[in-house]
Amino acid sequence: MKTLCSLLLIGCLLFSYDTPVVGELKHLGMTAETEWCRLFEGFCHDKNCPPPTSHVGSCHPEKRSCCKDRR
């Protein structure tokens, strides 16, 4: 019984926290959003897009706006 409880405790401790791999996957998603914005000749802006630009999407971290010049 002690062995079973010990194995269960070890298993819970191993899977109870975010591993570094999960952090890396979040970073990849952030990079993909930013690269998507720059691919369409946009730029990330902290708040609303400035007047000569338009909102075309979002840059993932902090939900920033992806802005592009109107042409």
Curated annotation (Swiss-Prot):
Which Gene3D superfamilies would you find in this protein's record?
Antimicrobial Peptide, Beta-defensin 2, Chain A (3.10.360.10)
Which Gene Ontology cellular-component terms appear in the entry?
extracellular space
Q: Which Gene Ontology molecular-function terms are recorded?
A: CCR6 chemokine receptor binding
* Keyword annotations: Antibiotic, Antimicrobial, Defensin, Disulfide bond, Secreted, Signal
Q: Which GO terms describe its biological process?
A: defense response to Gram-negative bacterium; defense response to Gram-positive bacterium; innate immune response in mucosa
Q: Which cysteines share a disulfide bond?
A: 37-66, 44-59, 49-67
Q: Name one Pfam family in it.
A: Defensin_beta
Q: What is its main location?
A: secreted
Signal peptide (UniProt feature, chain positions): 1-23
Q: Where, if anywhere, are coiled coils annotated? A: none
| Compartments (UniProt record) | Secreted
Q: What does this protein do?
A: Has antibacterial activity.
UniProt family annotation: Belongs to the beta-defensin family.
Q: Per its record, how is this protein called by name?
A: Beta-defensin 10
What is the organism of origin for this protein? Answer: Rattus norvegicus
